[in-house]
Amino acid sequence: MLILASASQSRKKLLENCQIEFIQISSNFDETSIKEKNIFNLALELSFQKANSLSKSIKKISLPEEINYGPLGILGCDSIFEFKGEAYGKPSDKAEAFIRWKKMSGEFGFLHTGHTLIIGNFDSTSNIFKITDTIKKTVSSRVYFSKLEDWEIKTYIDTNEPLYCAGGFALEGIGGKYIEKIEGCFSNVMGLSLPWLRKNLLKQKI
């Protein structure tokens, strides 16, 4: 059984589309408590803390009975967009989104997604989750943006989609038409590397 330690709807949809059985439980970890400056490492550390936080509180959560059979995997992910060495989270407002898109237009950046899969066994009788393994990796994809006119940028921003996405764009949404190409894992840009997950779920027999 897999638990997605995230409230992300894009990650949820990726797993559903691939028919991977899972349950979704949002992690309550405070992301602002991590001060790591390296963007690559920050994505990985945040993914670990999300999964680890849920693993510590799992005994307080009502889980399906089948959770007692076989290994349990807790998946934490965090995505950060890097543009010319600067971390781009969600834009604070439309003005900031416009400034960022003016810079990104015709350029490229990197979408880093930290992945952590905590493996263990949960015994509902004793309410104990015993961790047997922790697998971590940051997967990076290079994203190339189309050269856009100001009116195109404004039209996109007026949809409000950029305000809810790391980097100010959503590949799976309206913003997808403004992306020229991707080098690396495609699904990683949507918040979860499916090839990485598949390989590790098979390895752990989840």
Swiss-Prot record:
- Active site (record annotation): D78 (proton acceptor)
* Transmembrane segment boundaries: none
Q: Where in the cell is it found?
A: Cytoplasm
Which keywords has UniProt assigned to this entry? Answer: Cytoplasm, Hydrolase, Nucleotide metabolism
Cross-referenced Pfam families, in alphabetical order?
Maf (PF02545)
Alphabetized Gene3D superfamilies for the sequence: 3.90.950.10
Q: What is its main location?
A: cytoplasm
Q: Which GO terms describe its biological process?
A: nucleotide metabolic process
Q: Which GO terms describe its molecular function?
A: nucleoside triphosphate diphosphatase activity
Which InterPro entries does the entry mention?
ITPase-like_fam, Maf-like
Catalytic activity reported: a ribonucleoside 5'-triphosphate + H2O = a ribonucleoside 5'-phosphate + diphosphate + H(+); a 2'-deoxyribonucleoside 5'-triphosphate + H2O = a 2'-deoxyribonucleoside 5'-phosphate + diphosphate + H(+)
Q: Which cellular component appears as one GO term in the record?
A: cytoplasm
Q: State the EC number(s).
A: 3.6.1.9
Entry cofactors: a divalent metal cation
Q: Which HAMAP family does this UniProt record tie to the protein?
A: Maf
Function comment? Nucleoside triphosphate pyrophosphatase. May have a dual role in cell division arrest and in preventing the incorporation of modified nucleotides into cellular nucleic acids.
The similarity comment for this entry is: Belongs to the Maf family.
Stated name of the protein = Nucleoside triphosphate pyrophosphatase
Question: Which species is this UniProt entry from?
Answer: Prochlorococcus marinus (strain MIT 9312)
